[in-house]
């Protein structure tokens, strides 16, 4: 799955709105919205927070190598 699909998948598996997911990982709603629409990608710090969120919630996602 590509990155925007992966972010949406993570959020939906955790049963969170974009706003709630944003709060969980310490970014704005608009940032999560841009990620899910494929308009931008997270920086290294945000990726670490997303990874920590996935690990804490036992969520596994395999991103396409070309999209990361």
State where each predicted segment sits.
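Short alpha-helical DNA-recognition segment
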Residues: 15-33
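DNA major-groove recognition helix of helix-turn-helix/homeodomain DNA-binding modules
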Residues: 44-63
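Short acidic DE-rich linear segments
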Residues: 65-68
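A detector for short, charged/polar N-terminal pre-domain segments
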Residues: 1-2
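Short basic helix-loop element that most often maps to the first helix and adjoining turn
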Residues: 5-20, 49
